[in-house]
């Protein structure tokens, strides 16, 4: 397929090209197999880097349809049982790059091409002065440095699941384990020194891992021709970890993001409260902290991580949870009587951080 689209207020069209395929096989309602592939091309990458192949494979075994299972005593209780697994790769070609003019990250295109920026004469910090007096003129300057080696970001996803039904499917449950490894993540290069005067295009340098489990349980029953009810619940646990983010070597070892979940906050560790002024005198100075002009008994006392006698940003360490919950759960029920029905569902989250500002 070929795809051509236009963005809002954008003259250059977006273009992509690709081919997809699928093969499905089933034998005797017991053995299932599926193979998919996508061969995709993106305008964001240079020739020789534009296309990526992303296959996936899935297998399933309906154990409850096996003759030996039907003859077993367990089939009288667990009437259905299935195990399944899948392994696949997907790609991402959307690139977010730092824009020094806007001082923010924006979606970037054609990062394999050198970028040049128009200099606005109304901006006194960036315009040029020629001749005598304050005669500012427009011009062109070098912008983001091209990266011709950039290519697809890939994600390898593994899933193993179990499905079961008990008491003629009056009680069913599904449990899944998943593992995802994102590699060659399109990440902004952080190792270019500031005296270069510009920024480098994103590169395939990031690696992040994500894994967890999901559980779903359902119970439903009919009581007579007019009344039925159902109860259901679910729970999931997921945790990600940064493997590599291209962090500069100058970053303190205990402040590097590698080994922690994405966006783990850096905070100071408290040791309690200052008891008196003697306690303040014996402790590392906290006057370097923002807003701290004086320290009094009853104020929080922080730990000097690097032992230099001063509490500042270099004493912050990765601590606590991120604002993305690791645990999500829910439960609910429904009741039906003739044409009347009533249902409710509760949801909750756990193991996440909230920053409270006094």
Q: Which residues does each predicted region cover?
A:
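Conserved small-residue
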Residues: 97-114, 119, 222-323
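Outer-membrane beta-barrel translocator domains and adjoining extracellular loop/strand segments
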Residues: 6-12, 46-51, 71, 96-100, ...
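Extracytoplasmic gating/loop element in the C-terminal half of outer-membrane beta-barrel translocons
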Residues: 42, 295-297, 349-358
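Outer-membrane beta-barrel proteins
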Residues: 7-11, 23, 45-49, 71-73, ...
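Extracellular/periplasm-exposed beta-strand and loop segments of Gram-negative cell-envelope proteins
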Residues: 7-10, 143-151, 186-192, 199-208, ...
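Surface-exposed extracellular loop regions of Gram-negative outer-membrane beta-barrel proteins
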Residues: 1-4, 13-45, 50-67, 155-158, ...
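Solvent-exposed loop/turn elements at secondary-structure boundaries
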Residues: 70-153, 172, 176-208, 251-252
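Extended hydrophobic secondary-structure segments that form protein cores and membrane-embedded regions
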Residues: 1, 79-88, 230-237
């Amino acid at each position: 397929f070929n795809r051509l689209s236009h963005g809002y207020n954008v003259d250059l069209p977006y273009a992509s090209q690709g081919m997809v395929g699928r093969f499905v096989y089933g034998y005797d309602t017991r053995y299932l197999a599926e193979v998919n592939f996508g061969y995709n091309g993106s305008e964001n990458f240079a020739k020789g880097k534009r296309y990526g192949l992303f296959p996936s494979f899935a297998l399933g075994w309906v154990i409850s349809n096996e003759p030996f299972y039907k003859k077993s005593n367990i089939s009288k209780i667990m009437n259905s049982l299935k195990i399944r697994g899948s392994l696949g790769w997907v790609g991402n070609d959307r690139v977010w790059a730092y824009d020094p003019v806007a001082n923010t990250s924006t979606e970037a295109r054609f990062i394999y091409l050198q970028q040049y920026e128009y200099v606005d004469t109304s901006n006194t910090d960036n315009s040029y002065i020629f001749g005598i007096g304050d005669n500012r003129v427009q011009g062109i300057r070098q912008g983001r440095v091209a990266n011709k080696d950039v290519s697809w970001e890939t994600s390898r996803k593994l899933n193993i699941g179990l499905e079961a039904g008990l008491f003629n499917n009056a009680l069913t449950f599904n449990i899944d384990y998943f593992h995802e490894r994102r590699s060659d993540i399109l990440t902004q290069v952080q190792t270019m020194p500031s005296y270069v005067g510009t920024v480098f295009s994103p590169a395939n340098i990031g690696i992040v891992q994500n894994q967890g489990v999901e559980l779903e349980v359902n119970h439903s029953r009919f009581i007579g021709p007019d009344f039925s009810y159902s109860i259901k619940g679910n729970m999931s646990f997921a945790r990600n970890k940064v493997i590599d983010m291209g962090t500069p070597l100058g970053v303190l070892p205990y402040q590097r993001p590698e080994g922690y979940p994405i966006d783990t906050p850096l905070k100071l560790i408290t040791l309690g409260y200052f008891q008196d002024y003697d306690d303040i005198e014996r402790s590392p100075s906290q006057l370097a902290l923002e807003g701290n002009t004086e320290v009094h008994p009853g104020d929080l006392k922080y730990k000097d991580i690097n032992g230099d006698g001063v509490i500042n940003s270099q004493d912050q360490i990765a601590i606590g949870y991120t604002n993305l919950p690791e645990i999500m759960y829910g439960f609910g029920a429904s009741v039906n009587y003739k044409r009347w029905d009533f249902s409710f569902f509760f949801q909750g989250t756990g193991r996440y951080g909230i920053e409270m500002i006094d």
